Amino acid sequence: FSQGGKFMIRQMTTMRIASDKEKEQRHEIPLFPCSTYISDWKKGGIDGCHWHWHKDVELICVVSGQVKAYCNGQSYLLEAGDGFFVNTKALHRYQAQGHELCHVCYIIFNPELISGGIGTIYHQKYIAPLINDQTFPCQFLDEKRQVDKQILQKLKLVFQAAETAQPGYEYDIRYNIGKALLQLLLEYKPLAYKTAKKPLRMERMQTMLDFLHWHFNE
């Protein structure tokens, strides 16, 4: 992907991470809270990113190489074509594997970009059940699995729209992210419309992160 166009796909080389591991996330266009990035990781150089979390949702796609994703006490090996979903406030990190250059594209966005705000049916029916369920912090997207392949195809369309920045690209980005999230909800969280009990470990971890975030500077 190039870095031209109004909605520039930026190269991610460094991150600002607070003491409580929250990543500082600023979107270039505040009225359109969505950022697209590319990163090149390789052992011996910049080989990934450290533990962090953010209030935004993240979707990544591996273009080449191998990347190991860590989240919720699990690790997932992502190969070229695979992807990864990271829910809001989920602690995670990535690390390149092998000696081949890893080229990764990712999208970070405020859920309200898709829902239009908490007072909409889109938020209440589709977005809230996904982002408020801490039993669902992440999801590996296997390019060889048909449903995951459809989700990954939506991500590719998002990057194409961001790269070309043709008139109306905001609609294309919002639509394709929304469809990807809907497929995630329907395929992996069929019970998400019901209140799920949070695992005690996840609940304690989030409580600790929230406490550190609000009280560290006092």
What are these regions (language model features)?
Residues I9-S35, D40, Q95-F159:
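A hydrophobic/aromatic-rich effector-binding and dimerization subdomain
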Residues P137-D148, A162-E218:
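Short, Lys/Arg-enriched, Trp-marked, Pro/Gly-tolerant hinge/linker segments that flank
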Residues E58-C61, Q150-K154, N176, Q183:
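Amphipathic, well-ordered alpha-helical segments in soluble domains
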